[in-house]
Amino acid sequence: MSLFAAIGYMVREVFVFVSYVKNNAFPQPLSSDDERKYLELMEQGDAQARNLLIEHNLRLVAHIVKKFENTGEDAEDLISIGTIGLIKAIESYSAGKGTKLATYAARCIENEILMHLRVLKKTKKDVSLHDPIGQDKEGNEISLIDILKSESEDVIDMIQLSMELEKIKEYIDILDEREKEVIVKRFGLGLDKEKTQREIAKALGISRSYVSRIEKRALMKMFHEFVRAEKEKKAKE
C-alpha cells in the first residue's frame, strides 16, 4: 500500500467513528473484565479488539466536545479531532501505569482538541471540513468532507492530487526519529522495497503491534500537518 493510500484509509476510518458520535449511536461501556480482555488482545495485534475499545469509548468524545461549545468552532470538526484523540489514546494506553483507560482517553481527547484550537488561533483561520483543500481530476474543488464521505477508491486520488510526492519530505520532517524510521521503512521511501511491520519489528527489536501503533500515530501527524498547511496556504491567497 502506498503512503497516500494509508493516509486515505486512516481518514475514512476516522469518519466511520465520527458518524457514531454524530448520531449518538454509542455502544454500552465495557465491563472491567471485557476491557482488560480486549486490551490484551489488541496488544497481540487483534484489530477487532482495538476497534471495539474505540467504539465503546466514543461517548467520551461527545462528552468532552460539549465543554468546547462556547468556542464557536464547528462541532463536526471538534468531533473529528476528538475522535483522533481517542484513537491515539487507545493505541498508546498502558494498563501498567495505573491510570484507568477512560481517564487517560478523556485527557488525550481534550489535549487533541486544545492543540487544534491553538493551531487555529495561531493561523487565525478556521479549519473547516467544508473548506476547499484541492481539486479533483476534472478541476472541481474538493473539501475534506468530500474525502471523508467518498465511497470509492477516488479518496486516494483526491489526497494524492494535493499531497504530491515532492511534498512528502516536509511532512516526514515533523515526525520524531522513531516514527520517521518506521514510515521510511514501511513505505520504501528512498529504499528498494517496502518492509512489512513484522520485518520492521525484528529490525528495531520491538513488537509488531508497537510498530503498528507508531505507524498509525505517524500517519495521523502527517495528515494533520497536510490539512494545516493547506488551510494556511488558503488563508494567504
Curated annotation (Swiss-Prot):
Q: Which GO terms describe its biological process?
A: DNA-templated transcription initiation; sporulation resulting in formation of a cellular spore
Question: What does the PTM comment of the record read?
Answer: Proteolytically cleaved in the N-terminus probably by a SpoIIGA homolog to yield the active peptide.
* A Pfam family hit: Sigma70_r2
Q: Gene3D superfamilies per the record?
A: 1.20.120.1810, Winged helix-like DNA-binding domain superfamily/Winged helix DNA-binding domain
Q: Tell me the GO molecular function terms.
A: DNA binding; sigma factor activity
Please explain the role this protein plays, according to its UniProt record: Sigma factors are initiation factors that promote the attachment of RNA polymerase to specific initiation sites and are then released. This sigma factor directs the transcription of crystal protein genes, a sporulation-regulated event.
Please identify the protein, giving its name as recorded: RNA polymerase sigma-28 factor
Q: Which organism is it from?
A: Bacillus thuringiensis subsp. kurstaki
